Amino acid sequence: MTGKLIWLMGASGSGKDSLLTELRQREQTQLLVAHRYITRAASAGSENHIALSEQEFFTRAGQNLLALSWHANGLYYGVGVEIDLWLHAGFDVVVNGSRAHLPQARARYQSALLPVCLQVSPEILRQRLENRGRENASEINARLARAARYTPQDCLTLNNDGSLRQSVDKLLTLIHQKEKHHACL
């Protein structure tokens, strides 16, 4: 593979969806943002995803049309095999990844994988979770506790406390720095 798979991870409320939406608005000739296939309604949540029924999801998985798939929070998530075509064509591909399923991505993509962990200070994360209004106070506390204890090892860290524009700029800088380093090896 000639492209890099950027596996973007972060706690719920860390700003992954906003970051990916903004990234899609930027003109990047060799960078694509992959949509996830999810067994939830297209109108649910803020992520731009492809909604599938469980039957559709399992059909795609059974036909090896998903490069990666996992189950979390009562839903099934997948990334289509089209990302492999994009990577082979030399594109870098950004995926809204799962922290718990990073080992699965590492096993499949090995040195082509660039894991990036989006981090937000607890105060800002709490504020974002409260503002979106999807969780009650105890659910917010549980999400904050999980975010504090669950940071993958061996991944680049991107702080998302600042503006969305700053975070996208930082992400693009991280990607380009890794490309330069990889080209020099």
Swiss-Prot record:
Its EC number(s): 2.7.4.23
Keyword DNA repair: no
Enzyme class, first EC level, given as a word: transferase
Keywords per UniProt: ATP-binding, Nucleotide-binding, Transferase
GO MF terms, alphabetically ordered: ATP binding; ribose 1,5-bisphosphate phosphokinase activity
Catalytic activity: alpha-D-ribose 1,5-bisphosphate + ATP = 5-phospho-alpha-D-ribose 1-diphosphate + ADP
Matches recorded under Gene3D superfamilies: P-loop containing nucleotide triphosphate hydrolases
Pathway in which this enzyme or protein is active: Metabolic intermediate biosynthesis; 5-phospho-alpha-D-ribose 1-diphosphate biosynthesis; 5-phospho-alpha-D-ribose 1-diphosphate from D-ribose 5-phosphate (route II): step 3/3
Pfam families for the chain: AAA_18
Function: Catalyzes the phosphorylation of ribose 1,5-bisphosphate to 5-phospho-D-ribosyl alpha-1-diphosphate (PRPP).
HAMAP family in alphabetical order: PhnN (MF_00836)
Family: Belongs to the ribose 1,5-bisphosphokinase family.
Name the record gives this protein: Ribose 1,5-bisphosphate phosphokinase PhnN
Organism: Escherichia coli (strain SMS-3-5 / SECEC)
The gene coding this protein: phnN
